[in-house]
């Protein structure tokens, strides 16, 4: 189908567009502009300088001679007298001459120190060695040289001048190596989660940045029927609201999971609210970590968190740094109350 069309185009290759446009009359050019306006009404294919229509096609009102106009303007400028000043210049100087202020010269006067006669007599009669000992005791090391300090300290410690050194040696800096990457095999963990492997109790996907969003949703779908995984962590995996919504649907069904960690992700208030609403019906989850998201969640979301913690008595650990005092206090009281209930149940079980 394409070959006949290309053969028809061969006829127009050698045509000169400029010559065709030059042979068109003014009426034909206007018709061509109308057709082009229908094809491209916003003139998106034209440069910005050519989108405005020509509005200067008017008949001249008279002859125009540039040289004659310039000579006329020059003649008018020479014949026109300058306007005289209404207030003549008298040469009077106004204002004050700027004189920089001289900064006061600071003079230091030596303070006269009066000592007790006994101390003054002792310092006057003291030898250089005794004065060096006194300076070393007082910590005034800038008053004595390194040689004198060596003679004083070395003689007292039994060290000669050749082997004496007062250079402070710094400790070696211990190298801090980067943490190794997460060794978890994502595909294998997903397969074992779907198969409900009894030996798979904890899934740790922390700091694995390249997990696709559909794969994280598959984990949430697999956890709906899994009865062995008790701890699931996907911190710093670039999870977003769709992932949070998928895990919220999982929490409504799952009755085994005890801990869920979604910290340091891109979840907004919409995803967090979905998780909070799911926990109203969940009676098994005891720990939830949702802190350090990309953006602040806001007061309304924090109030819903506090309300959920007051209604759900099974949450014992809640990882989130509240920004408002009211929700923070309510959440702290609710967590304390839930832990007290667990302690009372344990005590009652011990008595029985």
UniProtKB/Swiss-Prot annotation:
GO-annotated biological processes: actin filament organization; erythrocyte development; mitotic cell cycle phase transition; muscle contraction; myofibril assembly; pointed-end actin filament capping; positive regulation of mitotic cell cycle phase transition
Protein name, per record: Tropomodulin-3
Broad class of where this protein is predominantly found: cytoplasm
Known tissue expression: Ubiquitous.
Family, per entry: Belongs to the tropomodulin family.
MF-aspect GO terms: actin binding; cadherin binding involved in cell-cell adhesion; tropomyosin binding
Modified residues (Phosphoserine): 25
Keyword Phosphoprotein carried by entry: yes
Gene: TMOD3
């Amino acid at each position: 189908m394409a070959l006949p069309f290309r053969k028809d185009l061969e006829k127009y290759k050698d045509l000169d567009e400029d010559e065709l446009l030059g042979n068109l009359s003014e009426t034909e050019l206007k018709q061509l502009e109308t057709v082009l306006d229908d094809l491209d009404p916003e003139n998106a294919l034209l440069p910005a300088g050519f989108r405005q229509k020509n509005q200067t096609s008017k008949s001249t009102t008279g002859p125009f001679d540039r040289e004659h106009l310039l000579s006329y303007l020059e003649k008018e400028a020479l014949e026109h007298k300058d306007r005289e000043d209404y207030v003549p210049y008298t040469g009077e100087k106004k204002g004050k001459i700027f004189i920089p202020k001289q900064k006061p010269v600071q003079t230091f006067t030596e303070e006269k120190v009066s000592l007790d006669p006994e101390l003054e007599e002792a310092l006057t009669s003291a030898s250089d060695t005794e004065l060096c000992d006194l300076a070393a005791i007082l910590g005034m090391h800038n008053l004595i040289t390194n040689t004198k300090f060596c003679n004083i300290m070395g003689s007292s410690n039994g060290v000669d001048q050749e082997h004496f050194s007062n250079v402070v040696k710094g400790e070696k800096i211990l190298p801090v190596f980067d943490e190794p990457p997460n060794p978890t095999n994502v595909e294998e963990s997903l397969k074992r989660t779907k198969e409900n492997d009894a030996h798979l109790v904890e899934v740790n996907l922390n700091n694995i940045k390249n997990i696709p969003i559909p794969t994280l949703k598959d984990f949430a779908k697999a956890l709906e029927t899994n009865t062995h995984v008790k701890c699931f962590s996907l911190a710093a995996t670039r999870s977003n609201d769709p992932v949070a919504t998928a895990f919220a649907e999982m929490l409504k069904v799952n009755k085994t999971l005890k801990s869920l960690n979604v910290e340091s992700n891109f979840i907004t208030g919409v995803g967090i609210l979905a998780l909070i609403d799911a926990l109203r019906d969940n009676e098994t989850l005891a720990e939830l970590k949702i802190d350090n998201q990309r953006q602040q969640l806001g007061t309304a979301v924090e109030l819903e968190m506090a309300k959920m913690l007051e209604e759900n008595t099974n949450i014992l650990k809640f990882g989130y740094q509240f920004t408002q005092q009211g929700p923070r206090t309510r959440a702290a009281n609710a967590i304390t109350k839930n832990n007290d209930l667990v302690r009372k149940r344990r005590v009652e079980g011990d008595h029985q």
